[in-house]
């Protein structure tokens, strides 16, 4: 059977017994192929009543898996074929780099790393519990021929290990002995055909090793320390996209999360936008912003599919991007993996998950430390909540609260000048119902560029009986006097004329007649247009964290930032490569961190939207 070798590989790693009653298990595979080992491991996890809460599977592949070959390869195994059919749709549109795919309610996380084996290993920032090693000359034909496995590849593997990590190689791997031994692995061999697998099945496993170096393990290259900490209680300040996504990611990992907001209901600020677009940023040099948005959009669409009602709360319509800022003749871009989405509905869905409690009308004015816990205080000094960790996800309000905290507790060493500069930017959306105009007036899909038009959005519970269109959005720093609604409407109409001249002409009468509604709020934007995610103080186990500054890209960034924060709390594989993760560091203004970024060739300068 096709799964025999993979099941044997699982057995030689001591699984599923080794992960029994663990919070999480982390597996690294050096050659994904068509996913046989992943599917077999996932099946074993599903079938085990004592499975860990989280299964992390990181796999390197030279190219995205071929969906037809993946399904054909599992045809002889009905159980694996069912799982392959869940995997296949998420393999659409994979590109070079890290791709995070989620299954079983976010409890099975597959991180596919598409690219050169050694480069992908060096971009990791976690310690695996098990490693499936399959050398393949095609991974790097000029350097890693099976007969000459290079020591630096073994070193890259060692960097992904903790003491006790088990490694198995389901091939003839004699040529790996010297390099792996030199890097701290203690090896044993298994003769091909020896019955060690399930039900005494023959096996082709030829190498088994355990990482147990004679020296003290030091990980000086770990610039984003990922030390797993005991699951406990957490308070999140802010119930918008940033706060709700953090709460959902932590609750899936067993945290008890209290979300506090000064408003009576969630998504009362900029996250209350009636509708937004989930679409990646594109740049000629594939800058940091583009790469981050690609990863974030994939994660967000996975959340929408699992939590929201398609056609009512969101729809995967695709989005047409007009290249209005380019030279004449630059073609438009069609984004098939893009959607419109109602942020408020997503926030509510996140906050409805088990382990999360929402507390409205709760303005946090100060914090007080009591032993290992933090007390969140209201304006009168009364305690709103107590938790072992606090996440500031309250947009622009975070900086004012941090100023107060630093003044009260100077020993915390929270230097506000190390955080990216944040400012509020007002935005107004113009919208109206589909009345008085034929349906063919509107494009069948959203269009974005310098602004956006979302033409078909249901605004009731009748799934399309009452439809509205939305055009936006204006962009004005809150340091300036607010512009009147009429001026912002005119700005939005001018943008619409550029995006879709025909539609702009058709809707001009509604704007002129004052038959257009306005929705407005203030975004929180960082100077470099990237969110701020990370600890606020430099200690071994920081209790204060930030996840803020999403700007106009909350739908692209929020789930990515939440998963990045949760991964760092839990010692998990990161959803993006370590180089990209460093660009989001909350304290990225610190001198030591700035110097490290300046030396890194992996981090091109971010580009503005």
Curated annotation (Swiss-Prot):
**Any one GO biological process:** methylation
This entry's Enzyme Commission designation comes to 2.1.1.61, 1.5.-.-
* Required cofactor names: FAD
Q: Does the keyword Methyltransferase apply?
A: yes
Instruction: Tell me the superkingdom of the source.
Output: Bacteria
* GO CC, any one term: cytoplasm
What segment(s) does the record annotate as region tRNA (mnm(5)s(2)U34)-methyltransferase? 1-229
**Keywords linked to the UniProt accession:** Cytoplasm, FAD, Flavoprotein, Methyltransferase, Multifunctional enzyme, Oxidoreductase, S-adenosyl-L-methionine, Transferase, tRNA processing
* Renumbered residue ranges of the record's region FAD-dependent cmnm(5)s(2)U34 oxidoreductase: 237-609
Catalyzed reactions: 5-aminomethyl-2-thiouridine(34) in tRNA + S-adenosyl-L-methionine = 5-methylaminomethyl-2-thiouridine(34) in tRNA + S-adenosyl-L-homocysteine + H(+)
Q: Which InterPro entries match?
A: FAD-dep_OxRdtase (IPR006076), FAD/NAD-bd_sf (IPR036188), MnmC-like_methylTransf (IPR008471), SAM-dependent_MTases_sf (IPR029063)
Pfam families registered for this protein in UniProt: DAO, Methyltransf_30
Subcellular location per UniProt equals:
Cytoplasm
**Major location, coarse class?**
cytoplasm
Gene Ontology MF terms in the entry:
oxidoreductase activity, acting on the CH-NH group of donors; tRNA (5-methylaminomethyl-2-thiouridylate)(34)-methyltransferase activity
Q: Which residues form a coiled coil?
A: none
Question: Known Gene3D superfamilies for this protein?
Answer: D-Amino Acid Oxidase, subunit A, domain 2, FAD/NAD(P)-binding domain, Vaccinia Virus protein VP39
Family, per entry: In the N-terminal section; belongs to the methyltransferase superfamily. tRNA (mnm(5)s(2)U34)-methyltransferase family.
Physiological role: Catalyzes the last two steps in the biosynthesis of 5-methylaminomethyl-2-thiouridine (mnm(5)s(2)U) at the wobble position (U34) in tRNA. Catalyzes the FAD-dependent demodification of cmnm(5)s(2)U34 to nm(5)s(2)U34, followed by the transfer of a methyl group from S-adenosyl-L-methionine to nm(5)s(2)U34, to form mnm(5)s(2)U34.
Q: What is this protein called?
A: tRNA 5-methylaminomethyl-2-thiouridine biosynthesis bifunctional protein MnmC
Q: Which organism is it from?
A: Albidiferax ferrireducens (strain ATCC BAA-621 / DSM 15236 / T118)
Q: Which gene encodes it?
A: mnmC
